[in-house]
UniProtKB/Swiss-Prot annotation:
Organism: Karelsulcia muelleri (strain GWSS)
Entry function: Binds directly to 16S ribosomal RNA.
GO cellular component, one term: ribosome
Keywords annotated in UniProt: Ribonucleoprotein, Ribosomal protein, RNA-binding, rRNA-binding
Name recorded for this polypeptide: Small ribosomal subunit protein bS20
Length: 79
């Protein structure tokens, strides 16, 4: 267990950040699933999902290579 006030504060901050990252990642994953289900109908959703994935990579929630890989798979799926 943490002994200092600053260590306790860091734990609180880390827990909050973890929850925020988890939420953003989950919403992106559900958006990707929706796009996969409606790939031919919903072509307008790809730019939004692509920007979400880029934001995840920019915030280092996912690795930039993984974001490129996901976007590449989605483009192949749409075309």
């Amino acid at each position: 267990m943490a002994n200092t006030k600053s260590a306790l504060k860091q734990i609180r901050k880390n827990n909050l950040k973890r929850l925020q990252n988890k939420f953003v990642l989950k919403t992106t994953k559900t958006a990707i699933k929706k796009l996969k289900l409606e790939s031919k109908k919903n072509l307008n959703a790809f730019p939004k999902i692509s920007s979400l994935i880029d934001k995840l990579a920019k915030k280092k929630i996912i690795h930039k290579n993984k974001s490129n890989r996901i976007k590449s798979k989605l483009v192949k799926l749409i075309n």
